[in-house]
Amino acid sequence: MTFSDYMDYLRGKRIGVIGFGVSNQPLVRVLLRNGCDVTVCDRRDRAQLGATGDEAAAQGAKFILGADYLEHLDFDVIFRTPGVLPIVPQLRKAAQSGAILTSEMEAFCNLCPCRIIAITGSDGKTTTSTITAELLRAQGYTVHLGGNIGTPLFDRIPDIRPEDFAVLELSSFQLHSMHCAPDVAIITNISPNHLDVHPDFEDYVSAKCSIYRGQRPDGCLVLNAKDAHTPRFAAEAPGRVRYFSSIGPVENGVYCTDGVIYRAHDGKAEKILDATEIRIPGAHNVENYMAAFAATDGLVGNAACVQVAHTFSGVPHRMERIRELNGITFINDSIASSPTRTIAGLHALPKPPVIILGGHDKHIPFDTLGDEVCLHAKAAVVVGETAQRIAAAIRASKCYDLGKLPLVEAPDFRAAVETAYGLAQPGDIVTLSPACSSFDLFKNFEERGNTFRAIVESLQ
């Protein structure tokens, strides 16, 4: 089905758009521009929607707003926001009544005229997606990068050519019950996450599986050789499977051994580059590069791989150096919204840091994080909803030594940053690496990182 055909199909149907956030605003504009009957459903009130709400109203949108925004979903087609899973009772009831449940991203995947490389996982999605896009661009392709990375693509479909590439970062919320058939899919890793939204861990894992379930036999799935869930994913994959590995050679894929990264085809290896040539630090970023190399194998040559490795300086809020003050270096790793990501950041730093931890409670365990903080941090400052849980995990660790690891609970975010600065000495590192999402105090991890930057820049 073409984009034009899809607009013809939707015209005349009652369309509900659940959530009026970043991804659904351009969707609403496109639907209204094409003469569709659109109702925006959002928990905010009319004033909170601001200028974008005024624009939609001027184009003919209707609204169901406030706390009961999910109670009257009498529509033929419903586009849900990623944050509202299709398993919520109101959406289930709507589906049982005949409504078609979809999303901006599912519609994009089904209508996109070019090849799609889709990336999911618990950690490293944005960096891997960005590296993949940079590799393709270095090879001369036109690339459309979007999805969970923050750039909606639905309204760009008419401008996408068959010879282009779409690189999509997909979250478990986007993938839940979604049908997609990417030409290449990557799963970076799997660890417990978002258990405040998913009913259980299996539901979270199953959502991730949607990235490959609809692939064609000629599709390719790229998997992490050391992840415990990889055998299951490989067995279920409809198409070819390639691996990226930091634990030894693989028959087909990309691996790193003795500090050298190779690509392998049927066991025959070819050097791509030395791991030390990668500009951004950390073993986890070597893995992100290997995943991207595996996904673009046959599309991107070694020269482009080396060029990107030498020049790509990373994505904001990911091990981002903010400033040095009185000999103390401040690192913004606000994206670290899970324990595994924070642990990877600790291992990437050249010395034990003063670490700022805590945020929104996603109901995931902190036991391993407690051990790693005791082993690899100089001091810890905890803040937010999870402050007491993280502090308890640190104190419960068999590695905990009160005399060696100062542990402070801060009353607010500014106090956390100022306390961390006070605990540091010249030559030390202070890192914001929360191991939690930001929604207790901030709209998103970007706002948290920007607030950290502003506080750090105000320090004397």
Predicted regions span which residues?
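Short beta-strand "acidic-cap" motif of Rossmann-like dinucleotide-binding folds
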Residues: 38-42, 145, 167, 243, ...
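C-terminal helical cap/extension that packs against the catalytic core
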Residues: 52-54, 59, 367-427
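Residue-level signal for inorganic ion chemistry
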Residues: 31, 78, 119, 148, ...
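N-terminal leader/targeting and accessory segments in enzymes
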Residues: 1-103, 107
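Phosphate-binding loop of NTP-binding sites
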Residues: 33, 71-75, 82-225, 229-240, ...
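Short internal beta-strands
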Residues: 37-44, 221-225, 356-357, 376-385
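Nucleotide phosphate-binding/pyrophosphate-handling subdomain across enzymes
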Residues: 3-14, 24-34, 142, 273-379
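Beta-strand->loop->alpha-helix junctions that form or flank phosphate-binding loops
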Residues: 39-43, 64-67, 102-106, 238-256, ...
